[in-house]
Curated annotation (Swiss-Prot):
Statement: the UniProt record of this protein carries the keyword 4Fe-4S: no
Gene: tal
Annotated compartments: Cytoplasm
Its biological purpose: Transaldolase is important for the balance of metabolites in the pentose-phosphate pathway.
GO MF term (any one): transaldolase activity
Name of the protein in question: Transaldolase
Domain of life per record: Bacteria
UniProt keywords, alphabetically: Cytoplasm, Pentose shunt, Schiff base, Transferase
UniProt key word Lipid biosynthesis: no
Gene3D superfamilies given in the database record: Aldolase class I
Length: 380
């Protein structure tokens, strides 16, 4: 029998979610079969995923036509399509949610990326989405921007599950963890239950290496000294994993804090680190590098379908999230070496700005293509 390495990962305390959703895989039964066959325990989605699913796909036409007949706006039609897919996916994963007592089985949907810098709009849209979709295993994705984190606290205090997305720096993760804790504290202070609320902190990986490797390649073009070249080469493809391992160490400190212990005593669930952007962009690297190196207890890894297949086939499964911590710290310190001189904080800030933009573009594109489709399908 062929070994599915994804199932071995689960035994080490990491849940595998899939970073993909479309009506095709819902209606064909493929999504349901992935729970049993591949061990998929949840779903993440984003505007780019929905653009790919909906644009040019006739499977949505009947619902678009129904929306036109009901005189819905393009945004209302968009929401009706996406909310239906999310609701159906929630129903498919409800047995996982029940079986794991609310640890897994979540489906994530993002608030519109156009409001990433607007705290109040993020709060109201998160509550509206959660209410409209009406499933307890729904997670609302909120960007971990300075404006997004107060929204996280408020939305958690309302009893809504949150996936905090677009985290690049360790500092942004720490702030996210405390935003979750503050939300639980506020809810507990109102005398309300906190034992059913779940949250993940989505920490991005491959984009970090792509950016830093690009900077290193530029420097390598100008360097002749072999020692300096070796220093630069030694950092390539190492920063994202090092950064993630340091974040995991911070997670361990936070769950040892008195504030967390007080919440844990009331039944609160730990906010798990979720490794995101885990498809390897550089063909010189292993296609499962961001899985193999970050397996560990109380974590999630969300994988696009090609990485799921690759990992099922040849992941080298072991608990590595806490291995080589000293080497990890060294990698991050080396960035400050005058010969390397990469400002990691600047890189992280740039990636956050780009990350929001990478969601706004497909969202806008999807709304535009829906507008075109509405025009085509509207009876003259």
């Amino acid at each position: 029998m062929v070994t599915n390495h994804l199932l071995e990962i689960e035994n080490l305390g990491q849940s595998i979610w899939m970073d993909n959703l479309s009506r095709n895989i819902i209606e064909s039964g493929e999504l349901k079969s992935m729970i049993g066959k591949k061990g998929i325990r949840g779903i993440t989605s984003n505007p780019a995923i929905f653009e790919k699913a909906i644009a040019g796909n006739a499977i949505y036409d009947a619902d678009i036509e129904a929306g036109i007949k009901a005189s819905k706006s393009v945004i209302e039609i968009y929401e009706s399509l996406v909310f239906k897919d999310i609701r159906d996916a929630c129903d498919i994963f409800m047995p996982v949610y029940e079986e794991t007592k609310g640890l897994d089985g979540y489906i994530s949907i993002e608030v519109p990326p156009t409001i990433a810098k607007d705290t109040e709009s993020t709060i109201s849209e998160a509550i509206r989405y959660y209410t409209a979709i009406g499933r307890e295993n729904l997670m609302i994705k909120i960007p971990g921007t300075p404006e997004g984190l107060p929204a996280v606290t408020r939305v958690i205090s309302e009893g809504i599950n949150v996936n905090v997305t677009l985290l690049f720096s360790v500092e942004s993760y720490i702030n996210t963890a405390w935003a979750y804790i503050e939300g639980l504290e506020a809810r507990a202070a109102k005398g309300e239950d906190i034992d059913k609320i779940a949250s993940v902190a989505s920490f991005f990986l491959s984009r970090i290496d792509s950016n830093i490797d690009g900077l290193i390649d530029e420097k390598l073009k100008k360097v002749t000294d072999e020692t300096v070249k070796a220093k630069l080469e030694a950092v390539k493809g190492k920063v994202a994993i090092a950064n993630a391992k340091i974040a995991y160490q911070e997670y361990k400190k936070i769950i040892q804090s008195d504030r967390w212990k007080a919440l844990s005593a009331k039944g609160a669930k730990e906010q798990r680190l979720l490794w995101a952007s885990t498809s390897t962009k550089n063909p010189a690297y292993s296609d499962v590098m961001y899985v193999d190196e970050l397996i560990g207890p109380n974590t999630v890894n969300t994988l696009p379908p090609p990485t799921i297949d690759a990992c099922a086939d040849h992941c080298d499964v072991d608990n590595r999230v806490e291995t080589n911590i000293e080497v990890t710290k060294e990698v991050m310190e080396n960035l400050k070496d005058p010969d390397i001189n990469i400002n990691i904080d600047q890189v992280m800030e740039q990636l956050l700005v780009e990350g929001i933009d990478k969601f706004i573009k497909p969202f806008t594109s999807l709304i535009n293509s829906l507008e075109e489709k509405v025009k085509k399908l509207t009876p003259v």
